[in-house]
């Protein structure tokens, strides 16, 4: 957890409110794609471990969010669940789970969403989770 001086250090280096909006927008991008593709036939494959699935929708959401983040924050690293890390040698890293609940989604169960986080030196500072079924967006930002 951050001390107040560390929170001030982060706030002095980045525009937290702007990054917070970008995180929420990213989660909403995922939300819209998940809604459009829900209950449609999709390509499903295994990522290795039994029950660890990936669908074409996971990949589509991840790609759209990465495009958006690279456009809005080109100097921030990205760690995406399906494609790995795009390292920019930054203290900041976006973490993307494009379809949190792939098994539920692929079986037609409505409990899934998109999760986005921003970490600073391996400490979480921003998080946003969209849940299409509930039409909700949950989010938090350190210091705001």
Tell where the protein language model's regions lie, with residue ranges:
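N-terminal subdomain of lithium-sensitive/metallo-dependent phosphomonoesterases centered on the IMPase/IPPase/PAP
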Residues: 1-99
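DPxDG-like acidic metal-binding loop motif
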Residues: 88-143
């Amino acid at each position: 957890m951050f001390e107040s001086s560390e929170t001030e250090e982060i706030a002095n280096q980045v525009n937290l409110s702007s990054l917070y909006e970008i995180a929420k927008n990213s989660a909403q991008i995922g939300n819209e794609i998940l809604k459009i593709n829900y209950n449609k036939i999709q390509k499903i494959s295994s990522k290795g471990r039994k029950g660890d699935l990936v669908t074409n929708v996971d990949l589509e959401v991840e790609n759209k969010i990465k495009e958006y983040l690279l456009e809005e924050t080109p100097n921030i690293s990205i760690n995406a669940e399906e494609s790995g890390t795009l390292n920019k040698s930054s203290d900041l890293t976006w973490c993307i789970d494009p379809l949190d609940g792939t098994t539920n989604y692929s079986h037609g169960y409505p409990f899934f969403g998109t999760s986005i986080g921003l970490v600073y030196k391996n400490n979480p500072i921003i998080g946003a989770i969209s849940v299409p079924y509930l039409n909700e967006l949950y989010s938090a930002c350190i210091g705001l």
